From Swiss-Prot:
Component of the DNA-directed RNA polymerase (RNAP) that catalyzes the transcription in the cytoplasm of viral DNA into RNA using the four ribonucleoside triphosphates as substrates. It is found in: Host cytoplasm; Virion. This is DNA-directed RNA polymerase RPB6 homolog. Gene3D superfamilies: 3.90.940.10. GO terms for cellular component: DNA-directed RNA polymerase complex; host cell cytoplasm; virion component. Its main location: host cell. It comes from African swine fever virus (strain Badajoz 1971 Vero-adapted) (Ba71V).
Length: 147
């Protein structure tokens, strides 16, 4: 997805979505996020929220991850829903083939490993208020079948 000057942020209890940059540089840093697993496009997107809360976010390096590299059905469904919502409001597709609905496009992007989103999994929250998370790219994860 190309850079967009006016980055739209849609937030609810589970999701923060952002415009993806072409480079995906994962840097260990302290950032803040929601309490549940989230879908994000870049770890750096949380930096703006650090000042708004006393809680900080610690990202586990890729080589020290402890959770499974398989998407849960919930995560896969949520990825499709968020991406379909982006496409429904005139987001650009990552596919060359034409599909009839945003949901079909989002499913195909996920299964073709072209979906421009990341999954943030919360590992634990420390007594000091630090949230320890892993950030996964769905392109490197196993994908469950969705009906």
């Amino acid at each position: 997805m190309a850079d967009n000057d006016n980055e739209d942020i849609i937030m609810d209890d589970l999701v923060e979505e952002y415009v993806e940059t072409e480079e995906e540089n994962f840097v260990d840093s302290e950032e803040e996020s929601e309490d549940k697993d989230e879908i994000v496009e870049s770890p750096s997107i949380c930096e703006g929220f650090v000042q708004a809360s006393s809680q900080t976010l610690v990202i586990i390096p890729d080589n020290e991850r402890i959770t499974s590299n398989v998407l849960t059905t919930f995560e896969a469904t949520r990825l499709v829903a968020v991406r379909a919502q982006q496409l429904a409001i005139n987001g650009s597709t990552m596919l060359k083939k034409k599909y009839s609905s945003p949901i079909d496009i989002a499913k195909q992007e996920l299964f073709n490993r072209k979906i421009p989103l990341l999954v943030m999994r919360c590992i634990k929250v420390t007594p000091e208020g630090q949230k320890i998370v892993e950030i996964w790219n769905p392109r490197e994860m196993g994908i469950p079948l969705l009906d």
